[in-house]
Amino acid sequence: MSIDALKNELPEYAKDLKLNLSSLGRETELDDQKKWGTFLASAHAVGEPKTLAAIKAEAETRLSDEALTAAKAASAIMGMNNVYYRFVHLSKNKEYATLPAKLRMNILANPGVDKADFELWSLAVSAINGCGLCIDSHEAELRKHGLTTTQVQAAVRIAATVNAIAAVLAAES
């Protein structure tokens, strides 16, 4: 499935999502690896089959094998970390924040791509999954790597749009 086919799957009431998907595909704040890695990590995180198939097909034409794997790895590790750290952050019992996580996270040390790209993809997935602690942590790392607020915003706009498209398609299936 292509991006155009994905847009055609959306009902008329989701026209804004179609338009956002088109404009985000042409987004110039991010280079192709950052942009399409964000698209893929976001689609992988939401998991809706049509959304994932279309975005994966496009990403495969724009990303190296290493970047494809790293984008999926960002989604996978954030699927775990976002739940754990959201719990730590939201729990009234602050003792949990003093305990070691005791969860393997080796991919964070060596993601196989530029660290800033992996952080950006992790931020996008964290936004989808609603982990404020993770969002703050990744955003701070991105700033250290020199990314601008408009670059970070572009990634979150991609995540938001992919999430909304997946929700519409899931509801309409």
From Swiss-Prot:
Catalysed reactions listed for this entry: N(6)-[(R)-dihydrolipoyl]-L-lysyl-[lipoyl-carrier protein] + a hydroperoxide = N(6)-[(R)-lipoyl]-L-lysyl-[lipoyl-carrier protein] + an alcohol + H2O
The protein's name: Alkyl hydroperoxide reductase AhpD
Keywords in alphabetical order: Antioxidant, Disulfide bond, Oxidoreductase, Peroxidase, Redox-active center
GO molecular function: alkyl hydroperoxide reductase activity; disulfide oxidoreductase activity; hydroperoxide reductase activity; peroxiredoxin activity
InterPro entries tied to this protein: AhpD, AhpD-like, AhpD_core, CMD-like
Top EC group: oxidoreductase
Family: Belongs to the AhpD family.
GO biological process terms, semicolon-separated: cell redox homeostasis; response to oxidative stress
Disulfide-bond pairs as recorded: C131-C134
Role description: Antioxidant protein with alkyl hydroperoxidase activity. Required for the reduction of the AhpC active site cysteine residues and for the regeneration of the AhpC enzyme activity.
Species per Swiss-Prot/TrEMBL record: Maricaulis maris (strain MCS10)
EC number: 1.11.1.28
Keyword Oxidoreductase: yes
Keyword Hydrolase in annotation: no
A UniProt-annotated Pfam family: CMD
Active site annotation, chain numbering: C131, C134
